Amino acid sequence: MSNQNAVETKTDVVLVGAGIMSATLGALLRQLQPDWSISTFERLDAVAAESSDPWNNAGTGHSALCELNYTPENSDGTVDIKKAVNVNEQFQVSRQFWAHAVEQGVLTQPKEFINPIPHVSFVHGEANAKYLRARYDALAGHTLFRGMEYIDDPAEFSERLPLMAKGRDFSDPIALNWSQDGTDVDFGALTKQLIGYIGKTGGKMYFGHEVTNLTQNSDKSWTVKVTNRRTGEKRTVRSRFVFVGAGGGALHLLQKSGIKEAKGFGGFPVSGAFLRCTNPELIDQHSAKVYGKAAVGAPPMSVPHLDTRVIGNKPGLLFGPYAGWSPKFLKQGRVTDLPGSVKPNNILSMLGVGVSELGLVKYLVSELAKNEAGRIWDLREFAPKAQAQDWELITAGQRVQVIRRAKGKGGVLEFGTAVVAAEDGSIAGLLGASPGASTAVPAMLDVLERCFPTEFQGWKGKLREMVPSIGVKLTDNEGLFNQVWDWSSKVLELDSAGASESAPVADTVATV
């Protein structure tokens, strides 16, 4: 994927950034419209070097199986599962596309990017155990959460989670929601395969090239200004469509584009850190993604988790996140990123968040004050016998949370992702963080439908081959869910027991 020497002047599609979002959109377009030319510009010298890198993101295969922030408790003690169902539906779409891509040779060797790992919710204390029981009662009978277990027996806990059981005082009640069918996704490896496919099929890749400006032309195309960061060479590229998949850098470019849809948006950067286990014996004692419950008043990003990862076919173990603060919008960004993002059209939104999100400010202050002993103290809630010498602190990627205008409040902080697309469909971008990468496919399908409404009608047949459930809520169609689940499990090598054949799956879906 070396740089091209010839200066390119025209292309059909420009992808800004070589992360999971651009890679997904590019791979979709390659399948749907192979005659369109695609040029990808990445400011760094490698694919997936920012938030898509496996050590820079949580990589949970976000499907709301274990993340408690998606299942808030109501005042009457019941649990609201709407967000969890929505996130899981989105992950099923991504999973289907990955399976299709494996069948088509777009992706190879699934175990390089996806592996089966149980997803587990963990709480302690009588009140929290009661909540987790209510969560189980709300989810266990649901199509998308079938097989979930509720565990409150110390012996069973100890058998399944020996690292977490060692040294634990079980006089304090514990409870688990255990989902055996969870996955770990290495989005770095996945992105590299998708970008490789785009390159092999004629897409042009420019690394060390930074997009510095975007100007719309009278024919609705865009003039994209690009600088080679190594040589200083500047070039302009004229493109019919631009996708800004630049992670934390997307806000700046969308602002520079001048589209009205980007006005009022702001970004709040939060840096992340994790403790990474360096003791192979401890890593071998834990094989699950275990998510806890955020402290009262703490933001969703603070949910602690002891997280098995599979990176480069090797298991690893992380605990965190610990929050920090930096004005940079990218891990390898600039300290001027935050102040440079403040504009007349979003300053009220930014100031509004400063007033309304005092809980976040308090959380960040407490996190910044933590030393090594404080971080190990947090870890011991999960692994009571944890010792500092077995863990190292690593810096993860920057998370830029979306700030959006809100009537009467100035602005509110949104913990999610938002697709921003121009009314004429000529440019789109993605803002925000979690659940992020796990919902890349539905997010990019949204981009396609909003930006190419005419072409989208003609693409529906092909899209149904890629995502058999497209246009259908699996929640309402258990039979279809069973088919696509069995098919994708087999193709992605997640179910060694085997499953039904894939050929008839797409044929069972009604026209969307």
Curated annotation (Swiss-Prot):
MF term (GO), any: 2-hydroxyglutarate dehydrogenase activity
Pathway, per record: Carbohydrate metabolism; tricarboxylic acid cycle; oxaloacetate from (S)-malate (quinone route): step 1/1
Keywords associated with the record: FAD, Flavoprotein, Oxidoreductase, Tricarboxylic acid cycle
EC id: 1.1.5.4
Swiss-Prot/TrEMBL GO biological process terms: tricarboxylic acid cycle
Reactions catalysed, as given in the entry: (S)-malate + a quinone = a quinol + oxaloacetate
Domain of life: Bacteria
Keyword Plastid carried by entry: no
Name of the top EC class for this enzyme: oxidoreductase
Required cofactor names: FAD
Pfam families (alphabetical): Mqo
Assigned protein family: Belongs to the MQO family.
Record HAMAP family: MQO (MF_00212)
PANTHER family cross-referenced by the UniProt entry: L-2-HYDROXYGLUTARATE DEHYDROGENASE, MITOCHONDRIAL
Official protein name in the record: Probable malate:quinone oxidoreductase
Organism annotation: Rhodococcus erythropolis (strain PR4 / NBRC 100887)
